């Protein structure tokens, strides 16, 4: 069409006063074109005006327009014999000065005047049309009247208005121009409806325009029969939309049409969008509708000025194409009916079986009974419809509209008059009872007109009605009637499609006119215009796939082409103004002929599947550039005339690069390739002295390409062509060397100063292949790409206004509620907003004060009370805050979602809790479930999308995408999980939607019900009546009623219908007497016996549960039936214990306010509550066990003679094994050997084997905690006989989540310490797989001889005694506690030592500061070890242990080899420590010249031999008291720290097992949580500081009191298992694990005390194990706090936070989610038995460390000083170095020592000066310098006092490693201080 219409060369708009574009020389300008006051254009240009020829005699009438055009302009007045459809629209008159009322012009003897042509003066005419631009006449004023008879003559060689006079009303002509019948077959006419390439002359278009003009004037023209005037205008509109804007001037009537749209735009521009939308939906004026579209789109494009709602409205309006086709609906219905009939009859493969199924589904008998019992009353209709809905399972669907339908429909049917029925009957009978069909009745014409209006949207004109009449009149028979109906259907479809195409054309015109830089001036407007054009293009494209639109495809393709031009233009404009991703450029340099160009194309193929674009710099224009992903520039530096350096710099840049192009359509083309490959023959493309050398070499990678085969051939065969064998297809013939950064040659890189470029040698090149080079380029481009664009609507904002002192409380409460309900809102303190409004984000909630100027929905907080977690239900946060919020506001605040987000990557931490789970079998299942998420409009859009997919399956993807973009989601919060065959989809919606899609099966059960959600209904109690508006009370009442009705509506309607039905057959008896209006009394309740009542009361009292009687009976019934859920197992345990202690209860009378009562009082003490493993049930299948089965190295398979597996046996040491009796029945074989000496104890079997496993397990009789796979097990540990498939077995019943199978019998159950206490003997099978039968271990004396040569001091036959709660046993080897101290007062401070904050620890009974004896102090320190701390529950601890192990696997090697001999392991130990309870003195005292003495060697050999068998060693320690400085307050109460001296044999075995693991952990302290091994006086502190500065995270510094004594044994056991995970799991490792997990024994003064809990400070690897314990307990506390708050932890918690742990010192860096529950975390730690405190040991609450305050860790304060990041030692720790000296042992510490080691003392104080220098010059000079000068003088030291700057420089040298650290400063780096024990607190 564009080619055809481009033939039109006449430019329209003579009314604008412009000279026509082209006139023939022999045709002067007609006189009627001259205005009443001459408009002399030519005279202005220096030419004489040309007058018209005298032959022009006919009077030209004004251009008529359709009747719906009502122009509103007031500047130009048209008059004459206007058609009747021209209605006046304005009475405004433009007057520009006194002018004559009329003027005349003589033209060849013919007088032309206003009167001659029947033109009315402006002040009389009301028909105002299109305005003209103002022009200046001779007097400079606008003429008052315009005599314009025909404004179109200047546009054509032969004016269509003039030629229309020779056209008769019937379309015939006088022969000068073709008739209408001939016009319809010309290319001019056909080109308007097709894309033909035939030539169309201007005369043909003129003739067509003449007929269209006549059709507008005369209704009898044949064009009006075939087309309405609206259609005729539509033809021109289609042409206008398809032609480029620059060529639209060539179209007829274009300027008038444009002026009409402009006028309409001015009239409606300021109207609201709703009014403009009415114009789009109701107006039949296409000019008005096109103007409306332009207004809507213009406001959308300028959304920055008119608001984002204008853009959203326009985007939605563009998609609402009214394509509803009644004809297609009828056809789809008929086709569906036929398909169903065919499926039931013809295509059904099993008709015999299908018909019975169909009969069963129809339920004909019941249906017949329902129909027979139907009554024609309202009640009858209700009963019948409800029965039908109940019969076919549609009660819930029909329940909401059945009552309305019954009432209104029944009344409507009853009120229908019989007269109307008889009239309709007579018409039908008159038509169909005759011998032939009679459609001449006007009734059928009315029906046809109504159908036409319903289908096309327009009332048909006379021509269309004539077609209807002709079609219906010819229907004289059945066949003719069918044909007539088909003809009408086809005609209706065509008219409907024409209207759709016209509508699309109007939108396209509006968009193309907006593609103007004067309108879209900024980049935001360009972006909006492009998006709208893309939306409209997708809509047009979707219609091209409609088979019924095939005739209009050429027009639709032209519309798409016009929109593509708009999109491409916007893309170019954006590209010029938008930052782009810099491409990756590489230069291949090398000699000619080596294969660079071929390698470049091969590299391009590896980078992209597209063919590369080619650019040559030898030409100055780049029209041939195609913009593909890879661009190749061959020999880019070959021309000296080209500034190729600047070209490359501009090309490899983030700023857009506009290419120089010659073609107009390529103007503005930018460079868009991702990768640039250039070749060059020069080693240095740009000289290093060039000003652009730095920018050039920084942007490119240079690869030197060499071909050794080619070089050798050329040197050996000069002048000969290189053969092909020098090249290989895999490019192995090339050697690629990648240079470093900024290399201008192979040897040198650029000098940044630019002075001497040969001063910096280049690093050696990297040898690389083409594949590696391609991968490197891809990675580099991915790194460069880092920008994303999101779009969504406005996000709601809420504010809670409170007092300043209440902000933290309100914030914490809202944070807790957010975590409890999985809310989506963003929470802030104050007005500052930190979260980005990306798609999927939630509402913004601010906690603000009354002074803040808040814009949003604000709620005043009347009171603030922080609720506990169990009370966070319903509207608790509203009650706690005293705010009045509607449920709608609560839902919006909690779950609002911005926009639509589709996530392909599923993160379990982001998934919401399900409310509905739907299994998708058909598309109807999904559609039915989606209705919950949608509004009514959204449901209609869903139906429409499904309908389109059914009609056009090819458009499914486009339709679904459009539906997702345009659908309206409900304002309610709904979460649905769709389980489909191909995967799982989770959809969450509330205003917007978030969707997660995965190909895996993901079952997430359970969600927050409406009653338990954050809404829960408003509770008005306590809010005060004045704070609650009446509207809110009424709304809440109606909401409550609706909730109640939604719960009971189904049952209510069914029961009501049943009541109506029963009332039919029930005689009604009138009640009489007193019983009238009364009924029998109904007693409801449960009767209990006295014993049951007592049990119920006792259960409520002991368990503190609010149980009703009904709940109690149901719970008791479930427990009696053997249910294995949590409550039933607990009740069963409680009830059995109650039966055992029944006689410990006594009935006591109690007198109180309520009078005399009797209660059961328990006489015996209540046993402490054990670990409850049911409080936190979890899906243990989600994570694997660390090492499979527990103690797997000591487990061996039991097989039958034929090799069939039967069960397992466990080695308990020295060749003794345990298993089960039914496992050993028959000919059992273990390790190919028969068991010997079998001893049976119940079901347990103990036996011997000659084959001894290298590992053995410890055994005991405690209660099991874990099953064989490490999962928690629940059991009451009560034994009885159970009937099994193998006979009666004596054991206990337990519950575990592990699935067992045949052959698992004999696997071990263990307690907290990993001790085997029972064996697996059976399960509940498929009916109850969680039930397990456990056979307990029974000790059997197998006379196992102890192999240890040194008898343990605790293995004596002396009785056990109790001393102050400690269980002890005499050892017979008394060891006294060392008395006295080595700490003395310095001679410099004999008089003022009391000023020091620390003193030597208490010396015992003779010490006046504290008279407590050393034995008393020792016993007091052992008291906390008598009870084990509870620690976390086993289930949570197991999960966290697996998380920590998984986290550590990232930086700790998996397998560490065990040391093979004891001597090597011994040399791994610190030889300055004691040897333990068996041998005295230090380890180094037993080593001379590298040889161990006999006592030590014998002890190590005996221990090592036992450890090689995997047996546990005696876990014993020598106890002592630490000689150290202590704070005065602790000295006064006798507090000293214990020293646990571990047995040297145990230390050696543990070093062999775990030393290498601990070294790996210490070496990677910068990557992990454990900071053991860190140097706090080195660069490692900077790494800590960087980790502390993690954005949007809170920092907590925590210390703990009595850390060692509060360590739970099961946590220590888990830490040891983690260490074992990273070993080779040898017998030595098993022995070390079993030893360290056993209870420690401390020995002093000849007494051995066995402790129950805690972790000895001298335990091997104590720092590592303490740190692991720290991580495990913090992780368990965090997991428990989150899950108590409603956040299900399904991810590795250690991936979400950072920790610094060194024993009891900890720093926690946590995100906001965890920070919100940190108070609960610390509460959980206290429940575990720990005592967390602040680092200053105060009792204040532990709060986050502000960002501007330093963090304390390891008694250091980490700060940034002018010298860098430093860890400052406490000032008091430095100062007390000067007060005390370590020397000989004494009991009079106030007397200075007799001899001072001056070198060591001088080094100590020198180090103190270095540390003090980091605190600043003032502290150093005023406090430290006087102290050290005094010490030098009075202590006789020989050192020079360093000045401040010297001390700073020395410490910096040690810190940075430029100078070696002295021994003492290196020792202090572990956090203990400069001189070991002196600095310890």
Swiss-Prot record:
GO molecular function: ATP binding; ATP hydrolysis activity; cysteine-type endopeptidase activity; RNA binding; RNA helicase activity; RNA-directed RNA polymerase activity
Domain (RdRp catalytic): residue spans on this chain: 1593-1718
Compositional bias of kind Polar residues: 1-16
Gene Ontology CC terms: host cell endoplasmic reticulum membrane; membrane
PROSITE patterns according to UniProt: CV_3CL_PRO (PS51894), RDRP_SSRNA_POS (PS50507), SF3_HELICASE_2 (PS51218)
Site entry: Cleavage: 148-149, 435-436, 791-792, 1070-1071, 1183-1184
GO biological process, one term: DNA-templated transcription
Residues of the active site: 1222, 1243, 1305
InterPro entries on file: AAA+_ATPase, ARM-type_fold, DNA/RNA_pol_sf, Helic/Pol/Pept_Calicivir-typ, Helicase_SF3_ssDNA/RNA_vir, Helicase_SF3_ssRNA_vir, P-loop_NTPase, Peptidase_C24
Keywords: ATP-binding, Covalent protein-RNA linkage, Host endoplasmic reticulum, Host membrane, Hydrolase, Membrane, Nucleotide-binding, Nucleotidyltransferase, Phosphoprotein, Protease, RNA-directed RNA polymerase, Thiol protease, Transferase, Viral RNA replication
Binding residue positions for ATP: 590-597
Domain named SF3 helicase: residues: 564-720
E.C. number: 3.6.1.15, 2.7.7.48, 3.4.22.66
Entry-annotated residues carrying O-(5'-phospho-RNA)-tyrosine: 1093
Segments for region (Disordered): 1-93
Ranges for domain Peptidase C24: 1188-1341
Domain of life, per lineage: Viruses
Biased composition (Basic and acidic residues): 37-50
Annotated S-S bridges: none
Record protein name field: Genome polyprotein
Organism: Vesicular exanthema of swine virus serotype A48 (isolate Swine/United States/A48/1948)
């Amino acid at each position: 069409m564009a080619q055809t219409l481009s033939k039109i060369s006449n430019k329209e708009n003579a009314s604008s006063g412009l000279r026509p574009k082209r006139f023939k020389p022999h045709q002067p300008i007609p006189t009627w074109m001259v205005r009443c006051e001459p408009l002399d254009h030519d005279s202005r240009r220096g030419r004489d005006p040309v007058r018209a020829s005298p032959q022009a005699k006919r009077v030209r009438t004004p251009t008529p327009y359709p009747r719906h055009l009502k122009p509103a302009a007031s500047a130009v007045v048209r008059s004459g014999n206007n058609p009747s459809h021209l209605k006046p629209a304005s009475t405004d008159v433009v007057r520009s000065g006194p002018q004559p009322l009329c003027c005349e012009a003589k033209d060849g003897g013919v007088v032309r005047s206003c009167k001659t042509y029947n033109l009315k003066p402006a002040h009389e005419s009301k028909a105002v049309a299109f305005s003209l631009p103002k022009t200046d006449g001779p007097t400079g004023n606008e003429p008052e009247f315009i005599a314009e008879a025909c404004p179109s003559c200047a546009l054509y060689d032969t004016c269509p208005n003039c030629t229309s006079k020779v056209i008769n009303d019937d379309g015939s002509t006088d022969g000068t121009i073709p008739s209408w019948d001939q016009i319809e077959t010309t290319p001019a006419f056909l080109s308007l409806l097709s894309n033909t390439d035939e030539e169309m002359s201007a005369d043909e278009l003129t003739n067509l325009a003449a007929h269209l003009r006549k059709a507008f004037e005369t209704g009898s023209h044949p064009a009006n029969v075939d087309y309405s005037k609206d259609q005729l205008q539509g033809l021109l509109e289609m042409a206008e939309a398809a032609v480029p804007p620059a060529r639209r001037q060539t179209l007829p009537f274009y300027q008038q049409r444009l002026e009409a749209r402009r006028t309409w735009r001015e009239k409606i521009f300021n109207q609201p969008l709703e009014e403009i939308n009415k114009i789009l939906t109701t107006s039949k004026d296409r000019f008005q509708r096109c103007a409306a579209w332009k207004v809507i789109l213009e406001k959308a494009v300028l959304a920055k000025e008119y608001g984002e709602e204008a853009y959203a409205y326009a985007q939605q309006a563009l998609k609402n194409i009214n394509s509803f086709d009644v004809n297609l609906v009828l056809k789809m219905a008929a086709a569906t009916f036929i398909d169903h009939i065919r499926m039931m009859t013809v295509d059904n493969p099993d008709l015999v079986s299908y018909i019975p199924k169909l009969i069963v589904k129809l339920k004909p008998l019941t249906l017949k009974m329902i129909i027979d019992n139907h009554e024609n009353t309202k009640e009858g209709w209700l009963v019948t419809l409800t029965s039908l809905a109940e019969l076919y399972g549609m009660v819930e669907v029909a329940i909401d509209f059945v009552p309305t339908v019954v009432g209104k429909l029944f009344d409507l049917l009853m009120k229908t008059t019989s007269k109307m029925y008889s009239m309709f009957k007579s018409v039908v009978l008159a038509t169909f009872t005759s011998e032939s069909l009679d459609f001449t009745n006007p009734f059928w014409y009315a029906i046809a007109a109504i159908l036409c209006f319903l289908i096309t949207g327009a009332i048909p004109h006379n021509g269309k009605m004539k077609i209807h009449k002709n079609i219906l009149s010819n229907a004289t028979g059945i066949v003719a009637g069918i044909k007539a109906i088909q003809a009408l259907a086809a005609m209706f479809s065509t008219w409907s499609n024409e209207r759709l195409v016209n509508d699309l054309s109007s939108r396209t015109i509006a968009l193309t006119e907006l593609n103007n830089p004067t309108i879209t001036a900024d980049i935001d407007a360009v972006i909006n215009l492009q998006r709208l054009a893309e939306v409209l293009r997708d809509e047009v494209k979707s219609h091209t796939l409609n088979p019924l639109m095939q005739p209009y495809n050429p027009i639709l393709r032209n519309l798409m082409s016009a929109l593509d031009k708009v999109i491409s233009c916007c893309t170019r404009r954006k590209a010029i103004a938008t930052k782009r991703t810099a491409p990756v450029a590489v230069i291949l340099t090398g000699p000619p002929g080596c294969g660079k160009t071929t390698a470049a194309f091969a590299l391009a193929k590896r980078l992209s599947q597209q063919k590369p674009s080619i650019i040559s710099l030898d030409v100055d224009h780049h029209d041939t550039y195609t913009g593909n992903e890879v661009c190749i520039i061959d020999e880019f530096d070959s021309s000296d005339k080209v500034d190729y350096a600047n070209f490359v710099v501009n090309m490899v840049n983030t700023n857009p690069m506009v290419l120089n192009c010659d073609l107009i359509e390529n103007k503005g083309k930018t460079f868009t390739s991702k990768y640039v490959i250039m070749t060059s023959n020069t080693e240095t493309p740009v000289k290093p002295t060039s000003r652009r050398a730095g920018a050039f070499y920084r942007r490119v990678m240079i690869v030197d390409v060499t071909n050794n085969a080619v070089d050798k051939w050329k040197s050996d065969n000069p002048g000969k062509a290189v053969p092909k064998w020098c090249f290989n297809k895999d490019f192995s013939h090339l050697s690629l060397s990648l240079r470093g950064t900024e290399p201008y040659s192979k040897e040198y890189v650029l000098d940044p100063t630019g002075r001497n470029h040969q001063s910096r040698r280049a690093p050696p090149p990297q040898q690389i292949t083409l594949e590696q080079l391609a991968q490197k380029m891809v990675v580099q481009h991915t790194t460069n790409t880092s920008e994303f664009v999101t779009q969504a609507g406005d996000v709601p904002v809420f504010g809670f206004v409170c007092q300043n002192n209440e902000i933290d409380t309100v914030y914490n409460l809202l944070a807790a509620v957010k975590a409890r309900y999985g809310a989506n809102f963003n929470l802030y303190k104050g007005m500052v907003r930190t979260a980005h409004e990306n798609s999927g984000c939630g509402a913004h909630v601010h906690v603000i004060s009354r002074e803040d100027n808040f814009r949003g929905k604000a709620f005043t907080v009347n009171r603030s009370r922080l609720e506990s977690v169990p009370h966070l239900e319903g509207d608790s946060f509203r009650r706690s805050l005293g705010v009045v919020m509607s449920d709608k506001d609560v839902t919006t605040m909690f779950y609002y979602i911005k926009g639509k987000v589709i996530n392909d990557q599923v993160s379990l931490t982001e998934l919401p809790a399900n409310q509905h789970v739907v299994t998708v079998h058909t598309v109807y299942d999904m559609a039915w479930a989606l209705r919950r998420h949608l509004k009514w409009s959204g449901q209609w859009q869903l139906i429409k999308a499904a309908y389109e997919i059914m009609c056009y399956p090819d458009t499914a993807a486009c339709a679904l995408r459009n539906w997702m973009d345009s659908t309206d989601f409900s304002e309610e919060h709904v979460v649905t999980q769709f389980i489909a065959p191909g995967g799982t989809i989770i959809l969450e919606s509330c205003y917007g939607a978030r969707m997660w899609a995965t190909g895996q099966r993901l079952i997430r059960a359970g969600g927050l019900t409406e009653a338990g959600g954050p809404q829960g209904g408003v509770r008005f109690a306590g809010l005060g009546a004045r704070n609650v508006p009446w509207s809110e009370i009424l709304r809440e009442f109606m909401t409550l009623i609706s909730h109640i009705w939604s719960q009971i509506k189904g049952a209510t309607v069914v029961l009501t219908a049943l009541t109506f039905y029963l009332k039919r057959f029930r005689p009604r008896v009138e009640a009489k007497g007193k019983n009238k209006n009364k009924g029998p009394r109904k007693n409801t309740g449960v009767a209990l016996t006295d014993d049951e009542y007592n049990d119920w009361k006792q259960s409520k009292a002991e368990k503190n549960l609010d149980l009703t009687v009904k709940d109690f009976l149901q719970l008791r019934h479930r427990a009696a039936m053997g249910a294995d859920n949590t409550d039933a197992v607990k009740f069963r345990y409680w009830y059995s214990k109650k039966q055992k202690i029944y006689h410990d209860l006594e009935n006591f009378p109690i007198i109180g306010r309520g009078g005399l009562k009797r209660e059961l009082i328990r006489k015996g003490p209540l046993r402490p509550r054990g670990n409850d493993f049911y409080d936190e049930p979890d899906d243990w299948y989600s994570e694997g066990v660390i090492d499979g089965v527990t103690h797997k190295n000591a487990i061996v398979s039991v097989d039958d003679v034929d090799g069939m597996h039967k069960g397992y046996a466990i080695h308990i040491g020295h060749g003794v094994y345990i298993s089960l009796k039914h496992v050993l029945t028959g000919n059992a074989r273990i390790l190919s050997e028969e068991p010997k000496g079998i001893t049976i104890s119940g079901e347990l079997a103990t036996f011997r084997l000659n084959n001894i496993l290298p590992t053995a397990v410890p055994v005991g009789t405690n209660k099991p905690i874990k099953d064989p796979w490490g999962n928690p097990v629940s059991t009451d540990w009560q034994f009885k006989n159970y009937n099994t498939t193998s006979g009666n077995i004596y054991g206990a019943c337990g519950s575990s989540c592990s699935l067992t199978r045949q052959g698992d019998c004999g696997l071990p159950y263990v307690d907290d310490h990993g001790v085997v206490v029972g064996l697996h003997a059976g399960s509940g099978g498929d009916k109850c797989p969680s039930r397990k039968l456990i056979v307990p271990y029974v000790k059997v004396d197998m006379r196992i001889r102890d192999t240890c040569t040194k008898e343990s001091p605790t293995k004596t036959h002396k009785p056990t005694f109790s001393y102050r709660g400690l269980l002890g046993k005499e050892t017979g080897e008394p060891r006294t506690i060392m008395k006295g101290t080595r700490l003395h007062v310095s001679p410099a401070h004999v008089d003022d030592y009391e000023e020091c904050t620390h003193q030597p620890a208490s010396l015992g009974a003779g010490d006046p500061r504290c008279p407590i004896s050393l034995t008393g102090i020792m016993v007091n320190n052992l008291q906390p070890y008598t009870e084990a701390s509870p620690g976390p529950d086993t289930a949570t601890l197991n999960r966290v242990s697996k998380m920590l192990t998984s986290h550590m696997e990232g930086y700790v090697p998996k397998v560490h080899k065990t040391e093979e001999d004891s001597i090597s392991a011994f040399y791994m130990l610190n030889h300055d420590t004691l040897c333990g309870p068996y041998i005295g003195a230090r380890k180094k005292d037993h080593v001379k010249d590298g040889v161990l003495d006999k006592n030590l060697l014998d002890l190590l050999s005996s221990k090592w031999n036992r450890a090689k068998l995997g047996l546990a060693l005696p876990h014993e320690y020598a106890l002592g008291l630490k000689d150290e400085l202590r704070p005065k307050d602790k000295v006064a109460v006798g507090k000293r720290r214990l020293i646990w001296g571990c047995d040297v044999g145990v230390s050696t075995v543990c070093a062999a097992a775990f030393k290498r693991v601990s070294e790996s952990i210490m070496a990677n302290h910068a990557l992990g949580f454990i900071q053991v091994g860190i140097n706090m006086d080195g660069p490692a502190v900077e790494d800590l500081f960087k980790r502390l500065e993690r954005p949007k995270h809170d920092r907590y510094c925590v210390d703990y009191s009595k850390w060692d004594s509060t360590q739970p044994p099961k946590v220590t056991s888990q830490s040891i298992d983690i260490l074992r995970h990273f070993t080779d799991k040898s017998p030595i490792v098993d022995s070390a694990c079993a030893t360290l997990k056993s209870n420690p024994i401390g020995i002093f003064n000849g007494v051995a005390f066995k402790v129950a809990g805690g972790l000895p400070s001298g335990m091997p690897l104590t720092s590592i194990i303490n740190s692991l314990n720290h991580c495990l307990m913090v992780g368990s506390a965090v997991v428990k706090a989150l899950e108590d708050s409603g956040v299900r932890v399904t991810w590795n918690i250690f991936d979400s936070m950072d920790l610094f742990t060194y024993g009891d010192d900890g720093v926690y860096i946590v995100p906001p989610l965890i920070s919100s529950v940190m108070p609960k975390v610390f509460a959980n730690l206290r429940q575990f038995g720990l005592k967390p405190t602040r680092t200053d040991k105060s009792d204040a609450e532990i709060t986050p460390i502000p960002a501007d305050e330093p963090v304390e860790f390891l008694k250091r304060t980490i700060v940034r000083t002018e010298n860098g990041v430093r860890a400052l030692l406490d000032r008091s720790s430095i100062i007390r170095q000067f007060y005390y000296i370590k020397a000989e042992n004494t009991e009079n510490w106030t007397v200075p020592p007799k001899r001072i080691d001056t070198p060591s003392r001088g080094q100590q104080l020198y180090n103190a000066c270095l540390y003090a220098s980091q605190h600043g010059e003032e502290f150093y000079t005023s406090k430290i310098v006087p102290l050290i000068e005094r010490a030098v003088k009075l202590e006789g030291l020989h050192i020079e006092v360093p000045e401040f700057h010297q001390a700073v420089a020395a410490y910096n040298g040690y810190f940075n490693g430029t100078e070696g650290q002295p021994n003492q400063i290196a020792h202090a780096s572990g956090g203990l201080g400069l001189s070991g024990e002196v600095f310890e607190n």
